[in-house]
């Protein structure tokens, strides 16, 4: 089962050190998601992360960074829904319904399905699927190894994610809420 970490939406002091330590401890993939931020901040963060880990980083915006920093790939979402012209490489995308999963899974290396549980980072963002719906979707082949669970995943329910048949779990609030990320850093 893949373990994917999504960055918090803002930059913070020593974020690169935490990310590097997590890679050293076995983090599979990092999704660099910093909506509404200037690309120079992403460039700065990437320059501080050892190059050996760049091939395990996926960007949610500023797609040119994929080639410039030899990153793993790009992630499509509502802000950046289109594959760049002539793009070749890893693609993932966000899905918020089982119908979207069916639609996008065939064109992506994997897709996120959210929210699977009540979100930790977005307090009013509740689970969109019952356990029965998830099991039914797995049995129907909708949820499989190409579908990554997102939303409210922590140490208390990560085993459920595996048992449901997801290909992995994407973590956000369960990890980043343990750090003081509220201090924006002007790189």
Where are these regions (language model features)?
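Short, well-structured alpha-helical patches and their helix-loop capping segments
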Residues: 93-96, 125-129
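A short acidic, helix-capping loop that chelates divalent metal ions and anchors anionic groups
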Residues: 117-124
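Glycine-rich S-adenosyl-L-methionine
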Residues: 129-136
């Amino acid at each position: 089962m893949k373990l994917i970490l999504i960055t918090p939406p803002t930059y913070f002091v020593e974020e690169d050190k935490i990310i590097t330590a997590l890679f050293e401890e076995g983090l599979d993939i990092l999704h660099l998601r910093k909506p509404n931020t200037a690309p120079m901040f992403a460039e700065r963060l990437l320059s501080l992360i050892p190059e050996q880990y760049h091939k395990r980083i996926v960007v949610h915006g500023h797609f040119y960074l994929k080639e410039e920093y030899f990153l793993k790939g790009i992630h499509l979402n509502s802000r950046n829904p289109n594959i760049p012209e002539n793009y070749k490489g890893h693609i993932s995308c966000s899905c918020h319904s089982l119908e979207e999963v069916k639609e996008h899974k065939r064109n992506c290396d994997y897709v996120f399905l959210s929210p699977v549980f009540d979100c930790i980072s977005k307090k009013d963002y509740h689970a969109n699927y019952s356990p029965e719906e998830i099991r039914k979707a797995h049995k129907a082949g909708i949820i499989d190894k190409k579908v990554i669970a997102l939303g409210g995943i922590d140490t208390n329910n990560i085993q459920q994610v595996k048992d449901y048949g997801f290909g992995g779990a994407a973590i956000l609030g369960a990890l980043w809420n343990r750090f003081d990320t509220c201090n924006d850093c002007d790189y």
